Amino acid sequence: MRGLFLLLFFPILSFGQLTKSGFRHTNPTLYVDWSGKIGSGKGLERFGKKTISFVCGNTLTIAHVTSGGVAPENKTVTYSTVKSSLSGSEKCWITQNLGSTSQAISETDATEAAAGWYWQFNKKKGYKNNGTTTFPTFPSTNSNTETSNWGASTDPCTLELGSGWRIPTVTEWTNVNNANLRAQAYAGALKMHAAGYISIGTSSALTDRGSKFFYWSSTYSDVTYAKGLVIYTNTTYNQISNNDKDAGLSVRCIRD
């Protein structure tokens, strides 16, 4: 009877809903339990499950943890994804900023939930700002002087979402910018919005949240600056610009 009970009960366990603190996956694999329910399966054994490859257009649930030195807080986020050719060829994009709790509800959404986290160029550590305070403490000196593009070992998209995810190159952002961006920034597929930036210096103030977009590319300019996409909501200004590498800008993630 004991064996019969286990046989009848075991197939309906929702393995995909279990999580284990401190474990992460590093590949875009979803897990399907025997009841047909899909879950992330991060940190779980594959016993009793089959795997399927991630399909763009589906949601991607990530358990962000601070122990990896990237996320500034522990939280689980379900990211929406979309296929788009705005970058010049078809890619998969998340439709919200990395670290955001939810997709923005407008291009001027000034909430912390929509803003997500901020990064200095070519650094893996993310920072959050609740509107008044940045955590962890933002560096107050200009020390980011390396002359290299953002690499996979420090790319927060790769480290947090898994292999294949990355920060867009300046060429990809340029193509996005040239595709009627001012009209399509939020209204289009990518749902981009004005999360502002964290300024450099001793104040490290949150600036322009709700009025300006600042997105890093993976491409550096020189010892001081790196390329990024900037959009102003109150004008027709949108362009690829040089941004101080020590400033904290938003990150969007793309997958080939």
Give the predicted meaning of each segment:
Residues 1-20:
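Bacterial Sec-dependent N-terminal signal peptides
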Residues 17-67, 75, 252-256:
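Enriched but not universal
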Residues 26, 33-35, 55, 63, ...:
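A structural detector for beta-sheet-dominated domains
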Residues 43-113:
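GGW-centered surface loops in extracellular recognition modules
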Residues 81-82, 95-105, 110-155, 159-256:
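C-terminal, surface-exposed recognition/capping segments
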